[in-house]
Amino acid sequence: MVADVLRQSVLVPISMYPQYPVPRRYTTSVFKEYQKKKKIYYCQRCLNHDVPRPRKNHKCECPYADCTCEKCGLVEKRRILNIRLQNYNQFNIENENDSKLIIVEDDDKKKQGERVPNCQKCGQHGRKSRLKGHKRSCPFRECPCAKCAVVSERQKLMADQIKIRRRQRKDTLLTFAKNSITSTMFPSNQISLNALNSLLYGSINTSPQPLLSSPTSSDASSCSPSMPFTPSIPMFMPTSADCSPTTQTPTSSIPSSIASTSPLMTSLPLRLSGFPLLNIRDPSAEASLLNLGCNADAAALLKTILDQYRMLEEASMSMSSSPSKDDESGDEDSDGLNSNSIIDVITV
């Protein structure tokens, strides 16, 4: 049964199969005809202003009909020359020989669909010569007649217009390439420049500052920029009590206005982990210090913290192995170190 079906299918002639026509759009001749039919001519004045608009039924609606720019001036000159040349061809026939058309045979045959330009100067004198390879051998190359002069002037105008079109095409390609590169490097989902600036500014302001600043300067300008207020000078003035021969201690009397109005002294919790030089391993000692800070008022708490930090600084300076140059320079360096350390402690 299967063999009979296969035999019948083999014996079916090819003509009985459905014939699907080959799409005509794939053939070369039809494509060229389609291209010829769909060729669109654009208004030259609108093209000068980068606005491609079809020329058909556009003359009365052209927004650049009265434009006096340099590019549109070339279009107007070319139009005038074409009108003049047509008038010469109609009314100024020099003799009978010029009225007869002389065709110069060309070895190259005209291909189907190929545009073959002819020499305009020879055409004005009744001859038809192919333009390819004819420029130097043209017998009317330097003809002084009025028609050849019009043709030469029109050729110059056309060359200028071609330069303008090439420049416009080049600018369009450069703009397209620039936009594509910009869209690839900077996608739309990336944050804007203002958002990036605010993010960087916020990260700089919230970045942690070092606990000890450089001892090269004793001025209060070395304070951290994130400090919300500027401390007054009497807060850091030393007193005669609890002074060592080489160091100075901060004052024991703090103005009540600073202690009462500054929320930084009372609201922020104090932890001994903020002092890296304070190596207290006994939990009871740490608890006593914290209880002392919690029970005392703001002035006594600040005095206790500064005294503890001063003692740690003295111990660290005595253990350092770098000798000082002389007594006066050593005193000045220690004063600068103490003042900078006090400023950093208050900032923390």
UniProtKB/Swiss-Prot annotation:
GO CC list: nucleus
Tissue: Dimorphically expressed in the dimorphically connected interneuron AVG; expression is observed in the AVG in males, but not in hermaphrodites.
SUPFAM superfamilies for the chain: Cysteine-rich DNA binding domain, (DM domain) (SSF82927)
Keyword entries, A-Z: DNA-binding, Metal-binding, Nucleus, Repeat, Transcription, Transcription regulation, Zinc
Disordered as annotated region, ranges: 316-348
Main function: Transcription factor. Plays a role in neuronal signaling in polymodal sensory neuron ASH, downstream of sensory receptor activation. Required for maintenance of AVG synapses.
Name used for this protein in its record: Doublesex- and mab-3-related transcription factor dmd-10
Organism expressing this protein natively: Caenorhabditis elegans
